[in-house]
Swiss-Prot record:
Pathway: Carbohydrate biosynthesis; 3-deoxy-D-manno-octulosonate biosynthesis; 3-deoxy-D-manno-octulosonate from D-ribulose 5-phosphate: step 2/3; Bacterial outer membrane biogenesis; lipopolysaccharide biosynthesis
Name of this chain's protein: 2-dehydro-3-deoxyphosphooctonate aldolase
Phylogenetic placement of the source organism: Bacteria, Pseudomonadati, Pseudomonadota, Alphaproteobacteria, Hyphomicrobiales
EC number: 2.5.1.55
Any GO molecular function: 3-deoxy-8-phosphooctulonate synthase activity
Cellular compartment(s): Cytoplasm
Length: 287
């Protein structure tokens, strides 16, 4: 282990650069990998939007939703089916790809086809999983647990950097506030930036989730996604994480949180305007 390494202040996935003082980048896509056709449809649409707006975009989706509320809930296609789809999106569409991993042995295999490995919020303190992800050399995006203080992410990031990987992102996705409720404390964004030294991402869609709020599945209040996204970008962040879907109300998971694809471009355009204003008046590394 290398105990002297510090997290990079900016990281590059494909042609997308993340840095707290750099122009805003986006991580976007559907919650769950539903099929090859669906993934390519959404990825192609997102690439067109990103090209029109001139913003860096990483495509995200999950091959396995391993922490669903109910055992009967759809979980995804699985890693074996997902790998060639991830590779096709990355290699033929030219979009960097992010997916989450839940077990140590998934890390090396997923890293063959994606640019960013994501550690789910519930697993953010699992040392062996963090080390396995770090060992791949890929960028590691760690979701801050709903139970964790923002300053505690310094210890999480140090596990990755001590393994010799400086390419880390940290993501705020809300904090538990009573039962089935999350709130967003915007102070967490500059605190995490200062504590970790890593680029900070704001997850605007999971922050409006109501965990387990529908009994056998999670609810959500997607109407507040633009509100929280604007607030976070006004504070100043490296990127926003926004799940989007052509028909969220019929999505197999997290539909109540996801932004309809038809509304995505207008939202990102607004966020870019907020970002330009926030970073124009900010000093370098202010967040």
């Amino acid at each position: 282990m290398n105990k002297s390494i510090a997290p990079a202040t900016s990281v590059v996935a494909g042609n997308v650069k993340f840095g707290n003082a750099l122009p805003l980048s986006v991580i976007a896509g559907p919650c769950q990998l539903e099929s090859r056709a669906h993934a390519l449809e959404v990825a192609s649409a997102l690439k067109e939007i990103a090209t029109r707006l001139g913003i860096g975009l990483v495509y995200k989706t999950s091959f396995d939703k391993a922490n669903r509320t109910s055992a009967a809930s759809a979980r995804g296609l699985g890693l074996d089916a997902a790998l060639p789809i991830f590779a096709e999106i990355r290699d033929h569409l030219g979009l960097p790809v992010l997916t989450d991993v839940h077990e140590n042995e998934q890390c090396a295999r997923a890293a063959e086809a994606v640019d960013i490995l994501q550690i789910p919020a519930f697993l953010c303190r699992q040392t062996d999983l963090l080390l396995a992800a770090a060992a791949t050399g890929r960028i590691v995006n760690v979701k801050k647990g709903q139970f964790l203080a923002p300053w505690d992410m310094g210890n999480v990031v140090s596990k990755i950097t001590h393994a010799g990987n400086a390419k880390v992102l940290v993501t705020e996705r809300g904090v538990s506030f009573g039962y089935n409720t999350l709130v967003s404390d915007m102070r967490a964004l500059p605190i995490m930036a200062k504590t970790t030294g890593a680029p900070v991402i704001f997850d605007a869609t999971h922050s409006v989730q109501q965990p387990g709020g529908k009994g056998t599945s999670s609810g959500g209040e997607r109407e507040y996604v633009p509100v929280l996204a604007r607030a976070a970008v006004a504070v100043g962040v490296a990127g926003v994480f926004i799940e989007t879907h052509p028909d969220p109300d019929h999505a197999p998971s997290d539909g109540p949180n996801m932004v309809p694809l038809r509304e995505f471009e207008a939202l990102i355009k607004t966020l870019m305007e907020f970002d330009a204003l926030a970073k124009k008046r900010s000093t370098v590394g202010a967040v």
